[in-house]
């Protein structure tokens, strides 16, 4: 109730925007977000999820997608080995998520961070373009600059930052 009330406070200021669930991994909160998105849709507010697509599709996630207007999907890399190095996860899950969005016809914006020395070479960007072209639900590709704003999270957890040697442009 509180979250929906807070979102609605901005209703008259929102011309083309809406409510975006982001931070951490919103798909981990699928049942909660489903209820929020249902309420926001009842108020005619646009809903979006900003996700890494790193989780397998579950019934709870699929139900959330029923109430999602837009997915902002991070594609870290289109190379399996590089994806695993950067995320410690499998690109197959990210790919399956995008394929599921394609099957469902859910509008998607792909986001890709240019990490110097990792994801910024011409060949990799060309592969990304070819990959995205296979999915008609992708309306936009956003190429984002690399930054080091997340370093402190690793420090607080006592973990080494995997891209510590990569300077921000």
Model segments located where?
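Cys/His-rich short segments
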Residues: 1
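Short, intrinsically disordered, charge-balanced linker/junction segments flanking boundaries
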Residues: 134, 166-169
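Short glycine/proline- and charge-enriched loop/turn segments
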Residues: 155-164
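Conserved AdoMet/S-adenosylmethionine-binding subsite of the radical SAM
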Residues: 4-149, 155
């Amino acid at each position: 109730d509180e979250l929906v009330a807070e979102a609605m406070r901005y209703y008259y200021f929102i011309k083309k925007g809406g409510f975006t669930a982001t931070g951490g991994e919103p798909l981990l909160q699928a049942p909660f977000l489903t209820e929020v998105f249902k309420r926001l849709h009842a108020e005619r507010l646009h809903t979006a999820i900003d996700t890494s697509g790193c989780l397998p599709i579950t019934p709870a996630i699929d139900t959330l997608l029923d109430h999602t207007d837009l997915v902002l999907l991070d594609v870290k890399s289109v190379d399996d080995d590089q994806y695993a190095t950067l995320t410690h996860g499998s690109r197959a899950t990210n790919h399956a998520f995008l394929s599921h969005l394609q099957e469902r016809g859910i509008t998607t914006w792909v986001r890709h961070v240019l990490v110097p020395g990792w994801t910024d070479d011409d060949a990799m960007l060309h592969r990304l373009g070819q990959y995205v072209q296979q999915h008609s639900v992708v309306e936009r590709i956003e190429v984002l600059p690399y930054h080091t704003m997340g370093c402190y999270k690793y420090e607080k957890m006592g973990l080494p930052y995997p891209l510590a040697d990569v300077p921000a442009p």
